């Protein structure tokens, strides 16, 4: 039947490609289109003459009744499509499995690699050279090893090239993003090829093959072909990721980066000397990621959905916020609180009340002088030049307000500063609304810097409102944990309506009256959420899905609290969202954004 080869695509390759496209759609960025499109062009042009030679030499044949008819340089159109669809499928597997990774961290081995990485690269290069030479030998010898030789001599020089330029990076990556995206599509295509060979859709002529089968009727040469080509695709994707990581991680090398880096920038990153890499910045990014993973599972999951320099700056912003919070929160006296907040205010003054470029050395000297070593990277790499100042000052003010629970005078309003709903809202504005505003400021800067002022103001306001909503959920979740620390964020006026005092909540943080107040706080949170959520659709598309995903994962905590009052799964008194439900929430948000 003339449609046999076409049916292979209709039954096996196109459905898989479609499924992977649907799965990957929410995280797809224009950078991914650039990567996949470039690899498809390269693979098509590299495979075309080689495949044409195989057919013209009668090594590979297609029964006339198995193909539709149109050919290019003797290659059936179905085979040409295979070049494209295989590259697309394997690239999608790579993207999906690599998305959680933060690639800039893997640049740390480029200048002075560990011995195992340096040795691994040399061994890998040696293996690829040996396979290439063996392939050449088989071609020269002719006979049964010809086809295998043609595969090895064609594929592995390309693999050697990519491994030479990115071997250290590839070896540093986890196996889940290198070996796994090679193995899964390879095994799948082995099974497809086994079916096609069994049906006679294509054939390898006897006399040019060894006659060994991996299983069934799958010739060892065909198995080697799919393995080798998928290695090429994954190596090619890794090369792209290395160059993109260089572009995004080092502002001193690439001060301005468009939404999609240009081909010229990729070339420039290729020829950047590793001595120019700012490894201190990479170490700072590593510290920031460690803070993020340890302190906020929801934000860590959401952050992996962002791309490029925006993702980096969001991580650095979070690291600063967490560091400032910890410095104040870990203080042992009111004097120490005042000392840290004064230093943080002065740090911000140096950025916003003086010429930053002229005072860069002064800022770094002040960081070294005033802060402990573990705090330096979070302060040094805060992207202050593209952040508004007012939310940062207000954030520190919020941390000061928090400290009143531990260090206060004898009055009740000083010991429990959340005296009424206005004070609660103000506190939420300080510690969470500001963070929402800062995140949106980064999104606008990286995704749509030309955004009209009116829309900017609207998004800033919406982000503040949503930040307060999330903080209310946080307070509702942590009533027990906060009470253990002597803190009560429920407004004192609300407590009086239930016949309680803050001391009652500290002593007995569970019970009917406290649950009534939890419900009330969640109700206020969802009112703010309902007000702000529709307006979040005005966020630039590249960041809309991840931003909404971050919001929804946190609001899901509130939904769990509402659904399972008195019976929620607790972790030190905190309601948790099961991992599967959290993932489902993120995916729903991404698809609907």
UniProtKB/Swiss-Prot annotation:
EC number(s) given by UniProt: 5.5.1.19, 2.5.1.32
- GO cellular component term of the entry, any: membrane
The pathway to which it is assigned is: Carotenoid biosynthesis; beta-carotene biosynthesis; Carotenoid biosynthesis; phytoene biosynthesis; all-trans-phytoene from geranylgeranyl diphosphate: step 1/1
List localization entries: Membrane
Instruction: List the InterPro entries hit by this protein, alphabetically.
Output: Isoprenoid_synthase_dom_sf, Lycopene_cyclase_dom, Squ/phyt_synthse, Squalene/phytoene_synthase_CS, Trans_IPPS_bact-type, Trans_IPPS_HH
Q: Which PROSITE patterns match?
A: SQUALEN_PHYTOEN_SYN_2
For region Phytoene synthase, the annotated ranges are 249-593
Q: Name one GO biological process term.
A: carotenoid biosynthetic process
Q: Which reaction does it catalyse?
A: all-trans-lycopene = gamma-carotene; gamma-carotene = all-trans-beta-carotene; 2 (2E,6E,10E)-geranylgeranyl diphosphate = 15-cis-phytoene + 2 diphosphate
Task: Write out the GO MF terms.
Answer: geranylgeranyl diphosphate synthase activity; intramolecular lyase activity; lycopene beta cyclase activity; squalene synthase [NAD(P)H] activity
- Membrane disposition: Multi-pass membrane protein
State the Pfam families in the record: SQS_PSY
Q: What is its main location?
A: membrane
Alphabetical keyword list: Carotenoid biosynthesis, Isomerase, Membrane, Multifunctional enzyme, Transferase, Transmembrane, Transmembrane helix
What superkingdom heads the lineage?
Eukaryota
Where exactly are the transmembrane stretches of this chain?
A: 8-28, 31-51, 77-97, 117-136, 147-167, 169-189, 231-251
Q: Where is this region: Lycopene beta-cyclase?
A: 1-242
Q: What is stated as this protein's family in its record? A: In the N-terminal section; belongs to the lycopene beta-cyclase family. In the C-terminal section; belongs to the phytoene/squalene synthase family.
Show the NCBIfam families listed in the entry: CarR_dom_SF
Q: What does this protein do?
A: Bifunctional enzyme that catalyzes the reactions from geranylgeranyl diphosphate to phytoene (phytoene synthase) and lycopene to beta-carotene via the intermediate gamma-carotene (lycopene cyclase).
Name of the protein this chain belongs to? Bifunctional lycopene cyclase/phytoene synthase
